Amino acid sequence: MAAPAGGGGSAVSVLAPNGRRHTVKVTPSTVLLQVLEDTCRRQDFNPSEYDLKFQRTVLDLSLQWRFANLPNNAKLEMVPVSRSREGPENIVRIAFQLDDGSRLQDAFCSRQTLWELLSHFAQTRERLQQLGEKTPVCVYMRNEVTGRAALQNTTLQSLGLTGGSATIRFVIKQCDTAGKQESIAVRSKAPGSPVSSLSADQASSSTLLPLNSGEFSRGDLNHEGDANTSGTGLEGGPKPTDAQTKQSTSEPASAPFVPFSGGGQRLGGPSASLRPLTSPSANSSKSFSGPGGPSKPKKPKPGEEPQQEPEPPVDRDPVVYHPDLEDLLQPWPAEVPDEFFEVTVDDVRRRLAQLKSERKRLEEAPLVTKAFREAQMKEKLERYPKVALRVLFPDRYILQGFFRPSETVGDLRDFVRSHLGNPELSFYLFIAPPKMVLDDHTLTLFQANLFPAALVHFGAEEPTGLYLEPGLLEHTVSPSTADVLVARCMSRASGSPPLLPAPDPVSLESEPIAEDGALGPPEPIQGTAQPVKRSLGKVPKWLKLPASKR
């Protein structure tokens, strides 16, 4: 009996008809037919007379291990084949795709090698005769067959092609060094594969390896070859030559790194210009230099985070405006008919749908972490670097100013006090609805929900006639002018929705705290002079509306 599989990788256990179990190591690119052939070769059976069965399912032997949907250490069983695989079922239709996009198609036997298939077509045969220092490569799915020796020893059946149709990509690439190819060959050999019987010289010039992606990329193969070359050097394998060592040591010496107090990498200079010239092999050799694996960058401690520079003060741009100074677009209707206030079935349905959507949003809201909430807050702060605040006085005058989100409620009080006619007046600020007095002067405007724009009410313990200074009241503007100033001064991030529309006198509605229509007269409702009577439709028996007319 074969020895059990050890080490890394996947393995499969096959039960032979004689009652013996054989363990086969597999890779993601191993074809199930190779597992069957390896077991039959060990137990002296004919592979064409048996199939592999997993539980109650007979497996498709043309599938690779990654597509067979089998667990690791799966227990397979050899069962007699229901129909012989000899005969017309072994005919496979192959299409070779060339570099120019053209395809060469024909039917072949599954026992034929890839070299015989390439020699069958005149176009590919001419390319094989004019190779020179180049190497022919055939790519099927994630398997790559490189070199003449591998093409002559790889059959369609070894690739899992025992019937149907398939497309194989044929390319000509430059020859790599023998050391790189040898390292790739050592990594790419799979147990039980048909290329395992090749000699060391043949393996150095031809390889059969699985690709990491479905797309053929020469750069990826070179990078993997460099990484494996450096990895084998640690185990006593072929070491780089003296010329390569001198070249790798001379490159960093020519551009010394000069640190600076800011941390990070220096921009510009000789080090930045020579950085793209560093070979991937040098990077891979550095990653394997430590005994414990590649080194990880150190994470800064919470106490060592760089302190942010204080933000420059923002221009307040104080402006006073009055809602009565705005010219109405249309005259208000003299009287609204009673039908306008009637609650119809459509109104109830619309309101019910809104309540359902709001309840669903609150119930299905995901639980977020503290770090996620802080990231959202930081994103909001970066999107709106300024805060537009408007203070509504009892005499309907509105004072507008700009602040930073990090400024406090105390700064807002100082701003209001500096524009009062009587600076000694005792007052308080609050937001509504619901009424909430801003008595904590240490809260930032962001923490007080005055972000990115809000309307704050002014309250005084001793009411007076005029609150603002007379010099400021002489320059009172219209609400539309104040809105234009907000749209001009508040810088927004690119792609974010506009905070305040310039021509529209409607006040800020970006936050729930801001009152609708409090900062300017609302637009008249279109068509209220001649209301359209809405049909009640069919009213359910359980719905009773006191104001509805039937």
Swiss-Prot record:
Annotated spans, Interaction with GLUT4: 313-376
Domain UBX: 382-458
Protein's cellular compartments: Endomembrane system; Endoplasmic reticulum-Golgi intermediate compartment membrane; Cytoplasm; Nucleus
GO annotation terms (biological process): glucose homeostasis; intracellular protein transport; regulation of D-glucose import
Presence of the UniProt keyword Metal-binding in the record: no
Residues recorded with modification N-acetylalanine: A2
PROSITE patterns for the chain: UBX
GO CC field: cytoplasmic side of plasma membrane; cytoplasmic vesicle membrane; cytosol; endomembrane system; endoplasmic reticulum-Golgi intermediate compartment membrane; nucleoplasm; perinuclear region of cytoplasm; vesicle membrane
Keyword Repeat belongs to the record: no
Lipid bilayer topology: Peripheral membrane protein
In-chain residues carrying the UniProt-annotated modification Phosphoserine: S193, S496
SUPFAM superfamilies documented for this protein: Ubiquitin-like
Compositionally biased tracts (Low complexity): 193-206
Key words, A-Z: Acetylation, Cytoplasm, Membrane, Nucleus, Phosphoprotein
Basic and acidic residues bias: start-end ranges: 217-226
Tissue: Ubiquitous.
Job description of the protein: Enhances VCP methylation catalyzed by VCPKMT. Tethering protein that sequesters GLUT4-containing vesicles in the cytoplasm in the absence of insulin. Modulates the amount of GLUT4 that is available at the cell surface.
Subunit-structure text: Interacts with VCP. Interacts with VCPKMT. Interacts with GLUT4.
Protein name: Tether containing UBX domain for GLUT4
